Amino acid sequence: MKLRIGTRRSQLALDQTNWVVEQLKTHYPDIEIEIKKIETKGDQLLNVSLSKVGGKGLFLKEIQNALLQGEIDLAVHSMKDIPTETTEDLEICAITKRVDPLDALISNNDITIDELPENAKIGTSSLRRGSQLKAYRNDLQIIPIRGNINTRMNKLQELPELDAVVLAKAGLVRSGMTDSISQNISPEIIVPCPGQGALGLEIRHDNENLKEKLAVLDDSESRKAIGAERAFLNRLGGSCHVPVGAYAEIISNELHLTGVVASEDGQDVIKRSVQTHLSDNNKIPSTLGNDLAEELIELGANKILSELKEG
């Protein structure tokens, strides 16, 4: 069997794709795999805030086009980058077991958020991270930085004014850089991005043979948790590049979901948690996500998001 896999060009994307390749070769030793590196619009717009150009699909549209045109058979994405709206003729046939979905602080002198000096400057281009950091400590100053993991880590040495940067822990794990972590940031401080920490394997809808083979990489618990998070995000009409966070986990067959919407300055924060018992009903995660989103909408979430768009 021959398989052409499409991925972004970044080192993290390649690390993630190589992990998928290793898993597939474990299950199918005779498989022949070719990796095709594809540059996306999001990779090109390094000097622009993604929230300003419309965050949805910026890191996968070109890869999806290659899939639709038959240039590749499988696309490997970070789940957090995949829009909640489905693309016709394509489907996410597997969601891999989630690596730690939380965010992490990398700081000078290896100190925590609480230990940072007054008016400390933290590097992140994420409105979600920045707004929640401001809500937690309103003296903190958010400095926009873009680029891959190494680029953003290097900013800490290159920019003397920076005291810390915030990155997804999963990326640090996959890149073998966990020694740099100063603090694993609790969802009490920053609720992570929906889907963060897992990979989504996307194929053409009619490729039944490949769908069957990729089923071995699908993790049911991750699919349920992320299903709830993405339903929450979808109801709010957001993407990974708006100040919306969602974090779900399964504890003793109970699905727990926390959702947050925050204004950019951190002054207005709406955050709630819900839980439900899991059964064989596949609609439970999406129902939970929708219900939580409706609760936040009643509390004013749409007003916060519309003001952000207008601004």
Swiss-Prot record:
Keyword set includes Endoplasmic reticulum: no
GO biological process, one term: protoporphyrinogen IX biosynthetic process
Source organism superkingdom: Bacteria
Residues that bear S-(dipyrrolylmethanemethyl)cysteine: C240
Protein task: Tetrapolymerization of the monopyrrole PBG into the hydroxymethylbilane pre-uroporphyrinogen in several discrete steps.
Protein family according to the UniProt entry: Belongs to the HMBS family.
Protein name per the record: Porphobilinogen deaminase
Species in which this protein is naturally found: Natranaerobius thermophilus (strain ATCC BAA-1301 / DSM 18059 / JW/NM-WN-LF)
Name of encoding gene: hemC
